């Protein structure tokens, strides 16, 4: 049984009020990682999970919300399709090209699967592939923003991933936790939900430290909290571990967007979160900060 650690609110008020306001969120970005989409034993797609994910997203649309899905999985699905088990950097002449080739195969397959399931719920979905330049270049950013706005007006759910085949993978945005927060800031979302292979943020990696305590709410991302993720690596399938989730939290909360990390083992948590239930770790958006998105993305890997 996990020990829950509830951070006191600044004014001592009940943390429940932060959960209550989740009921009113209108524009929601949901991110799912590769490890959550696959069966861990075989690496094949978990269709049951994908089905529940799509159903939850369509139901959010039916509740009148604007919804974006940021999905990983292109490389993992591509690797499976061309029968590559491991991309070992020391054994490949050009490991990045191998990953990019896998992404080219896998992205199309992944979208095919999503399109099929979204169609079952009579929901139109779109694909948006982004690179660092989509945000840094003013005209690109303006066009991307307008495209999202039009898709929302049309009731379409945009499905986003990094354009791994043209991005220099690992030195551009590189992970979808960060990408999802960037997307949330770009579209002026009011909630970002990261579905992970863990319940939320702990005081330390609970897989390494049995005494790690669960943190229910983070009202202020202190340096101490940011350091909590730095040593982490995450699963063998996932890219960023907790570090990239905390970077995402920094981007989101500085843009006044609430963010939640929740466990993807039961994707039905999505509607429960929107019902104000106490699930996952909630990072509270900060109204007082100004966040310069293009500036941040331009300097991302220099920080
Ligand atoms: N402080 C922490 N709190 C929670 N999980 C942590 C922490 N530090 C490291 N981790 C690890 O990060 C993992 C989640 O990252 P990752 O595997 O990249 O997830 P995903 O593929 O879902 O994005 C957890 O399974 C956990 O082992
Ligand atoms: N863009 C890559 C995923 C990168 C990524 O961040 O993966 P993950 O840590 O599983 O969310 C892909 O689609 O394979």
Q: What annotation goes with each model-predicted range?
A:
Residues 2-124, 128-303:
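C-terminal catalytic "cap/lid" subdomain
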